Amino acid sequence: MIRRKQHIINLIRQKVNEIDNTAEVILYGSRARGDNKHDSDWDVMILLNKKNVDKKVEQTFRHHLLDIELEIGVPISVFVYSKSDWEGKYSVTPLFRSIKKEGILIP
């Protein structure tokens, strides 16, 4: 099971790198905590080193990860933000605190 998890994490990182190899990728939620169920989704935060990250950019990443979703049979929930916005205006949100506490950086 651990090998499968690592395989999926590697696939996610590889797909993100195909779009932006400088992006930070963070796994969070039940998969990061280790209390997931078999059908739990994969929660992924992608932080970009660019100022403007719009819905089109986020959709690009979502579509790029779709092949993995189809392969594993569970959703990959993706948030994409600029790193500066995430560490600035979003730093007061419960999601920020949760990801800071439990998130795992995918190298």
Predicted regions and their residues:
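Catalytic core of pol beta-like nucleotidyltransferases
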Residues: 1-24, 32-34, 38, 49-107
